[in-house]
Swiss-Prot record:
GO cellular component, one term: cytoplasm
Database matches in InterPro entries: aa-tRNA-synt_IIb, aa-tRNA-synth_II, aa-tRNA-synth_II/BPL/LPL, Ser-tRNA-ligase_type_1, Ser-tRNA-synth_1_N, SerRS_1_N_sf, SerRS_core, tRNA-bd_arm
Residues the entry annotates as binding ATP: 264-266, 351-354
Domain writeup: Consists of two distinct domains, a catalytic core and a N-terminal extension that is involved in tRNA binding.
Keyword Cytoplasm attributed: yes
Protein name (database record): Serine--tRNA ligase
HAMAP family to which the protein is assigned, alphabetical: Ser_tRNA_synth_type1
Source species taxonomy: Bacteria, Pseudomonadati, Pseudomonadota, Gammaproteobacteria, Pseudomonadales
Protein task: Catalyzes the attachment of serine to tRNA(Ser). Is also able to aminoacylate tRNA(Sec) with serine, to form the misacylated tRNA L-seryl-tRNA(Sec), which will be further converted into selenocysteinyl-tRNA(Sec).
Keywords tagged on the record: Aminoacyl-tRNA synthetase, ATP-binding, Cytoplasm, Ligase, Nucleotide-binding, Protein biosynthesis
Length: 426
């Protein structure tokens, strides 16, 4: 959430910066609400001062033996007006808060300006796509050949956009997740966490999924209890660990990593990536989250992105790194890098990780703070998150990039210890 003080003092500047994201801020409505708020607040404060004076007069009139009934009636009338003013102020503030919750973050000055993914800027590439000397098969054909990737049974169980993995491919999927977690914990300094897969609405509001993106979530309504939502990413549960907390500066940076299933309705993805595992309602992901001091968040974004890239490098998967433009960034981000891995059957790079610095945007929504050692006062932390990596899409990339002419799959060297030394599957 943006700082309401910034919005009041630099409304047009904020609107101009948001316009670069394709977001039209309703400046007129905000100005009208602010004017209403000031008017009601001024009137209420004047009325309160008058009521206090009348209340004081009652005591004085009583001492003089005068009739206090008219004064009492005035005070009672003012109390009613004050109560009505309070209700009016609360209604105005509720609408302002609702508007604030729907405003995306302001892009960092280093973010390229653009309308959509065509405005993204390639930062670097790593690896060279393999030139196969045989017809390339996609991951669906490779997996179904041996009955290890079963979309038909998954559809019988759950409907479209689900997958059933069996045998060596299920083991390879597990190996990938274990490899990623171990790398981030032992070499990148993250603390592993096992988190709930169901969260309440305030957690999703804290990270920015609610209220704007509720249609993308799976919701479990409960009578007499708070509704629960299946997490769309472990970013939600990991980041909210510090919600409502004041962290000692000596604890920073805090670095969490978790391997969880993720659940998304893919409400806006009708007709896109309907074949295979690229876009699923349920998929596994290894998620990294960092909680840092404000002055260190841009540096942390570079290291977070490097941590995700290391996974791809050790797996020997060609990829490219993109700086997302203003029009393609996620709701909560001030700056984002996307990693795209090479998918041979599609002859192009596909997103496999998104690494974002959210500044104090999520922290303000969550009231996550640290105590500044210089001032002794609480200040908002900065939060970052990134996929390290999406396990299903990494499996797709391994199957396709390590395929052989007979349809078998070579096991990447770094995964062999997790596969019992197995070198080839199929």
């Amino acid at each position: 959430m943006l700082d309401s003080k910034l919005l009041r003092s630099n409304l047009q500047d904020v609107a101009d910066r948001l316009a670069s994201r394709g977001f039209a801020l309703d400046v007129a409505r905000i100005e009208a609400l602010e004017e209403q708020r000031k008017t009601v607040q001024t009137r209420t404060e004047a009325l309160q001062a008058e009521r206090n004076a009348r209340s004081k007069s009652i005591g004085q009139a009583k001492q003089r033996g005068e009739d206090i009934a008219p004064l009492m009636a005035d005070v009672e009338r003012m109390a009613g007006e004050l109560s009505a003013g309070k209700v009016e102020l609360e209604a105005i503030q509720t609408e302002l808060d609702s508007i604030l919750l729907g405003i995306p973050n302001l892009p960092h000055e280093s973010v390229p300006v653009g309308e959509d993914e065509d405005g993204n800027v390639e930062v670097r590439r790593w690896g060279t796509p393999t030139a196969f000397d045989f017809p390339v098969q996609d991951h669906v054909a490779l997996g179904e050949k041996f009955g290890w990737l079963d979309f038909e049974t998954a559809a019988k169980l759950s409907g479209a956009r689900f997958a059933l993995l069996r045998g060596p491919i299920a083991r390879l999927h597990r190996a990938l997740a274990q490899f990623m977690i171990n790398l981030h914990v032992t070499e990148h300094g993250y603390e592993e966490a096992y988190t709930p897969y169901l969260v309440q609405a305030p957690a999703l509001q804290g990270t920015g999924q609610l209220p704007k993106f509720e249609e993308d979530l799976f919701k479990i309504a409960r009578e007499g209890e708070a509704d629960l939502y299946l997490i769309p990413t472990a970013e939600v549960s990991l980041t909210n660990i510090v919600a409502g907390e004041i962290v000692d500066s000596k604890q920073l940076p805090i670095k969490f990593v978790a391997h969880t299933p993720c659940f998304r309705s893919e409400a806006g993805a009708s007709g896109r990536d309907t074949r295979g595992m690229i876009r699923q309602h349920q998929f596994d992901k290894v998620e990294m989250v960092q909680i840092v001091e404000p002055s260190k968040s841009m540096e942390a974004l570079e290291s977070l992105t490097a941590n995700a890239e290391k996974v791809l490098q050790l797996l020997g998967l060609p990829y490219r790194t993109l700086a997302l433009c203003t029009g393609d960034m996620g709701f909560s981000a001030v700056k984002t890098y996307d990693l795209e891995v090479w998918i041979p059957s599609q002859d192009k790079y596909r997103e496999i990780s998104s690494c974002s610095n959210c500044g104090d945007f999520q922290a303000r929504r969550m009231q996550a703070r640290f105590r500044n050692p210089e001032t002794g006062k609480p200040e908002l932390v900065h939060t970052l998150n990134g996929s390290g990596l999406a396990v299903g899409r990494t499996l797709v990339a391994v199957l396709e990039n390590y395929q052989q002419a007979d349809g078998s799959i070579r096991v990447p060297d770094v995964l062999k210890p997790y596969m019992g030394g197995l070198e080839v599957i199929g």
